[in-house]
Amino acid sequence: MAPKTKEEKPASEAVEPKAEAKPKAEKAPKKKEKKAPAKKSAKEPAAGDAAEGDKKKKKAKVAKSETYKLYIYKVLKQVHPDTGISSKAMSIMNSFINDIFEKVATEASKLSRYNKKPTVTSREIQTAVRLVLPGELAKHAVSEGTKAVTKFTSA
């Protein structure tokens, strides 16, 4: 707000320049007025209706956040039942899975575009996994993925 008070003082002192250059002087306050209500409207919903603002924020967070924390924990307990994991390590694992998922999805999308097909099928996913993951890791991922798909289709 300090810059606004400084701007107001020169405007009140310089009445004569406004008379000389009315179009420029009139345009500048209009821009300032447009910016000020936008800031106030952004502040008012957060301060005025805290419950509604929180609900909107929660909905946005739920829609955007993809967490695999529960699944990471389940796999950890299957492999090492007596081992725990810190929250920082869990966050790192979650971001790692999100990165791999994004890479595989991007590669599968490219493959479907190369083949001029509108649908990404299990074949594109399998090829994308082979391209993204190295060596033995790709082989294990493909076998586990194939097993999961057959289990899903049979059920």
Swiss-Prot record:
Query: What molecular functions are annotated in GO for this chain?
Result: DNA binding; protein heterodimerization activity; structural constituent of chromatin
Q: Where is this region: Disordered?
A: 1-62
GO cellular component terms attached to this protein's record: nucleosome; nucleus
Q: Assembly and partners?
A: The nucleosome is a histone octamer containing two molecules each of H2A, H2B, H3 and H4 assembled in one H3-H4 heterotetramer and two H2A-H2B heterodimers. The octamer wraps approximately 147 bp of DNA.
Keyword S-adenosyl-L-methionine annotated: no
Record's compositionally biased regions (Basic residues): 29-40
Q: Where in the cell is it found?
A: Nucleus; Chromosome
Q: Does the keyword Nucleotide-binding apply?
A: no
Q: Which family does it belong to?
A: Belongs to the histone H2B family.
Q: What is the name attached to this protein's record?
A: Histone H2B.4
**Could you state what the record's PTM comment says about this protein?**
Monoubiquitinated to form H2BK143ub1; may give a specific tag for epigenetic transcriptional activation.
Against PANTHER family, the record matches this protein to: HISTONE H2B
Regions of biased composition (Basic and acidic residues) lie at: 1-28
Indicate the principal place this protein occupies in or around the cell: nucleus
Give the position(s) of the covalent cross-link described as Glycyl lysine isopeptide (Lys-Gly) (interchain with G-Cter in ubiquitin): 151
Functional description taken from the UniProt entry? Core component of nucleosome. Nucleosomes wrap and compact DNA into chromatin, limiting DNA accessibility to the cellular machineries which require DNA as a template. Histones thereby play a central role in transcription regulation, DNA repair, DNA replication and chromosomal stability. DNA accessibility is regulated via a complex set of post-translational modifications of histones, also called histone code, and nucleosome remodeling.
Keyword field: Chromosome, DNA-binding, Isopeptide bond, Nucleosome core, Nucleus, Ubl conjugation
Classification via Gene3D superfamilies: Histone, subunit A
Entry superkingdom? Eukaryota
Which lineage ranks, top first, belong to the organism behind this chain? Eukaryota, Viridiplantae, Chlorophyta, core chlorophytes, Chlorophyceae
